[in-house]
């Protein structure tokens, strides 16, 4: 019973954090409603056990001068993209964004510019094969955090997910991505936020 109370408390904290987030645009306002609804009404939202929708956290990683953004070339999407990944049972989504950034880029000296959510979005993921197993189409209920890293720290590639990691100017992030929806609705938004 104590674990259930703890989990409910963690979910309520995240719902409050998302409810307090001021949407940047209409996409974020609608996605905010959907994320809160899923958190309130669906089970296992912090686990991939929920095959319909689950929580993820992304990182918009900038250098200290704020003139470069760190991106990885994701094999599944065949595109340059921000860093991030699944909550996988972790309720601290900032911790997820930090963990995924380190895993995908090798950068260890990284910190949040703010502990508040930087953006949020519901991302549709098309069906794909991962580690030899088919994964059906589903939704990522995503929150993004603004992180800062040292641009000159050595980068490393997470070979099972990425084929490259590199710094780009904010404008180059939009051109580098081959995912039109991401370019128009996410990277465009993040470069001006």
Where are the regions a protein language model picked out?
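Acidic, metal-coordinating catalytic segment for phosphate/diphosphate chemistry
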Residues: 20-58
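Short, flexible micro-motifs
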Residues: 81, 87-88
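Charged phosphate-binding loop/patch that engages nucleotide di/tri-phosphates or the phosphate backbone
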Residues: 178-193
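Basic/polar N-terminal segments that are highly enriched at the extreme N-terminus
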Residues: 1-3, 192-193
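Generic N-terminal amphipathic, Lys/Arg-enriched alpha-helix
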Residues: 11-22
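Unchanged
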Residues: 88-181
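Short, Lys/Arg-enriched N-terminal segments with co-localized hydrophobic residues
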Residues: 2-11
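N-terminal strand-loop-strand
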Residues: 47-82
